[in-house]
């Protein structure tokens, strides 16, 4: 019998041997791993990679966030050193000049005594070089400080503006809600103020102390427009701007119609537009404005319904006139019928008077 020799290595051993013989061209041959030393790890293991990354991060330390403005300034300084130095010198000289002239204007040493002039000269002689040295030598430091101060100031002002705008918006909202809830009392107050203003204007014009002429009607229209603008702001919610403007234009339209009709009547009756004409015109607007004012106050939204109301009123008026004329016609018809009946009665009486006497005797005997 022949003895068969079987290999003592398994397939896993062959695979590991094959992997050991292969060399990674990027990493190079693997160094020998000392299993007896517990502190040594394979250089390409995952734990080794992690430890190496952490050690590199700790050695470099925390990275600072670069300021783009500082980087740009440093780049400009490195690329143009002469221009940068000249700029520093120019700014330093300008600062010294500003300090000198400010001190000169505030103190005015020419009006001082000799001791005052000497003190001023010594003070300026010490202050100006210090200012020049500080600005020139610490240019980057104070420019960064000024830039940071400006940035903080701008942010603070923006926050103040934002807070103020929010506060004013809330105040306007609260005032609008308050006006809407207490509109009747406020409307009466506005109306009384408007009446007082109009009477003051009319009184001044009447006494001759104020010669407005054409300005009178314009001022009256302006007062009326402002009044109804406030009125519509109060009676109608503030966010319905379309309805408010619609009502305002309606009031102005009514006032314009009154002005046109008044002037037309004055020209029709050969009445020239003078002070009296303007008083009549303004009084008409005053009466119309008061009527519309109270009507709108008692029935909010009346101005919006005014065209339909006027149309219905005109239709009702014409219908009433038609019914009146129809009634008058019916009355005249009734009178005609009564007159006809009276005529028939008279005709019957005349027919009875024309009967002969012999026929009357026969009828009586029968």
From Swiss-Prot:
Q: Which organism is the protein's source?
A: Schizosaccharomyces pombe (strain 972 / ATCC 24843) (Fission yeast)
Ordered alphabetically, the record's keywords are: Cytoplasm, Endoplasmic reticulum, Membrane, Toxin, Transmembrane, Transmembrane helix, Vacuole
Judging by the UniProt lineage, the source's domain of life is: Eukaryota
Task: Identify the GO cellular component terms for this protein.
Answer: ascus epiplasm; cytoplasm; endoplasmic reticulum membrane; fungal-type vacuole; vacuolar membrane
Ranges where the record places region Disordered: 1-39
Supply the name of the protein. Meiotic driver wtf4
- In which family does this protein belong, per the annotation? Belongs to the WTF family.
Q: Does the keyword Transferase apply?
A: no
Bias type Basic and acidic residues, positions: 1-29
InterPro entries tied to this protein: WTF (IPR004982)
């Amino acid at each position: 019998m022949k003895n068969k020799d079987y290999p003592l290595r398994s397939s896993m051993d062959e695979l590991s041997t094959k992997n050991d013989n292969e060399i990674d061209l990027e990493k190079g041959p693997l160094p020998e791993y000392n299993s007896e030393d517990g502190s040594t790890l394979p250089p390409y293991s995952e734990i080794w990679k992690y430890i190496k990354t952490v050690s590199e991060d700790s050695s470099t330390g925390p990275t600072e966030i670069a300021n783009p403005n500082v980087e740009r300034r440093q780049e400009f300084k490195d690329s143009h050193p002469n221009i940068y130095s000249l700029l520093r010198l120019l700014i330093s000289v300008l600062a010294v000049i500003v300090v000198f002239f400010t001190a000169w204007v505030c103190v005015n040493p020419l009006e001082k005594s000799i001791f005052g002039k000497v003190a001023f000269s010594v003070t300026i002689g010490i202050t100006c070089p210090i200012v020049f040295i500080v600005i020139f030598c610490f240019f980057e430091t104070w420019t960064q400080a000024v830039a940071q101060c400006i940035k903080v100031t701008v942010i603070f002002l923006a926050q103040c503006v934002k807070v103020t705008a929010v506060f004013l918006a809330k105040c306007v909202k609260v005032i609008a809600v308050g006006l809407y809830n207490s509109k009747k009392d406020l409307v009466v107050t506005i109306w009384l103020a408007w009446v007082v203003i109009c009477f003051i204007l009319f009184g001044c014009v009447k006494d001759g102390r104020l010669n407005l002429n054409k300005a009178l009607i314009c001022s009256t229209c302006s007062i009326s427009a402002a009044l109804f603008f406030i009125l519509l702001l109060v009676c109608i919610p503030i966010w319905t701007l379309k309805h408010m403007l619609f009502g305002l234009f309606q009031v102005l339209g009514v006032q314009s119609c009154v002005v046109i009709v008044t002037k037309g009547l004055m020209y029709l009756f050969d009445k020239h537009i003078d002070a009296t004409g303007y008083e009549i015109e303004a009084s008409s607007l005053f009466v119309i404005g008061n009527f519309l004012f109270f009507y709108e106050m008692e029935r909010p939204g009346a101005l919006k319904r005014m065209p339909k109301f006027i149309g219905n009123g005109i239709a009702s008026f014409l219908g009433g006139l038609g019914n009146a004329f129809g009634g008058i016609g019916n009355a005249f018809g009734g009178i005609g019928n009564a007159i006809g009946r009276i005529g028939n009665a008279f005709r019957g009486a005349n027919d009875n008077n024309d009967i002969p006497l012999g026929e009357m005797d026969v009828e009586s005997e029968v």
